[in-house]
Amino acid sequence: QQYCESLEERTTADFDATFKTNVYAMFWITRAALNHLSAGSAIVNTSSVQAFDPDAIVLDYAQTKAAIVAFTKSLAKQLGSEGIRVNAVAPGPYWTPLQVSGGQPQEKIVSMGSGTPMDRPGQPVEIASLYVTLASDESSYCSGQVWCADGGNGTL
């Protein structure tokens, strides 16, 4: 995720790299894993609230996260009869190393998450259990869903 103020500033190489990182890699890893999955297995992808309510400065990133939603829902339909569940998590603003490495305009980092009802960004530990639950048998009848964790904005 690298912010970009204008479509004209985004190069084809940057656009391609974002898709290769977020969409192609997920496709290749999932395809490679399929031979190792059996009934009761779970795939949990990472999308983003940007798939549903994109900021102007993350145009290519938001597109990839929307593609992950479609991939998740479609693959859940393909694999359901095999007993393999496919879901996604769509985080809102979370504090990660990505934020300080160009994922956000640096002047906006201090106010990151202030637009949520919780008035702060989430911490990775606050979303980890969602991934664990979706991967566990506790979610055995949950597939094709996107679970949002966005500090109360109710994106989905």
Language-model segments: residues:
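Substrate-binding pocket helix/loop in short-chain dehydrogenase/reductase
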Residues: 5-7, 11-16, 112
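Active-site helix of classical SDR
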Residues: 30, 64, 72
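Alpha-helical segment proximal to the catalytic Tyr-Lys
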Residues: 35-36, 77-81, 140
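Residue(s) in the substrate-gating loop at a strand-loop-helix junction
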Residues: 48
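Short C-terminal tail/terminal secondary-structure segment
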Residues: 53, 131-132, 143-156
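A glycine/serine/threonine-rich, flexible loop-to-helix segment
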Residues: 81, 93-116
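A conserved structural motif in NAD(P)-dependent oxidoreductases
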Residues: 116-127, 138
